[in-house]
């Protein structure tokens, strides 16, 4: 039921035929062998792993909904500004094209919003920007941001 003949692997490591062996299932044969790198076993197909993944997914979706932070998304990059500490956080999902940030900051500045903190992350064709503002975001501000070509979604987190 093993995927690797561990005795043969240790011998191959000793003879230099294999330089490194990475395993997520440590055992007495390979754990102490020179050239063997042992990592934590994720057990991805076990019932426990499925429960852990479900808990993790709930935690990450909750963090996105409550704070705007993204973690482990398939189509957006990880983006974390922690728990909001300003009166407003505005999150913008948009296309990853030139001049998006300058358009956002111009709109914010012209509407007399001061940015306390901000971040922008991209992955492929998409990007995600968050702005912590020193005053609450108005409906008019959201409408101006939504009107920018390439914006997919604007969310006011708080």
Regions found by a protein language model. Name each.
Residues 1-84, 128, 132, 158:
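Rossmann-like dinucleotide-binding domain for NAD(H)/NADP(H)
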Residues 71-158:
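A conserved regulatory-domain signal marking ACT and ACT-like small-molecule sensing domains
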């Amino acid at each position: 039921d093993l995927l690797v003949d561990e005795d043969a692997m240790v011998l191959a490591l000793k003879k230099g035929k294999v330089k490194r062996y990475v395993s997520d299932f440590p055992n007495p044969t390979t754990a102490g062998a020179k050239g063997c790198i042992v990592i934590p076993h994720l057990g991805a197909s076990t019932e426990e792993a499925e429960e852990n993944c479900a808990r993790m997914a709930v935690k990450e979706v909750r963090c996105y909904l409550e704070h705007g932070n993204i973690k482990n998304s398939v189509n957006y990059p990880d983006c974390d500004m922690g728990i909001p500490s300003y009166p407003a956080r505005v999150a913008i999902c948009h296309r990853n094209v030139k001049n998006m940030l300058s358009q956002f900051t111009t709109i914010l500045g012209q509407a007399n919003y001061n940015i306390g903190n901000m971040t922008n992350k991209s992955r492929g064709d998409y990007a995600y920007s968050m702005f912590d503002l020193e005053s609450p975001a108005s409906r008019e501000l959201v409408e101006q941001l939504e009107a920018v070509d390439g914006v997919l979604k604007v969310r006011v987190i708080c």
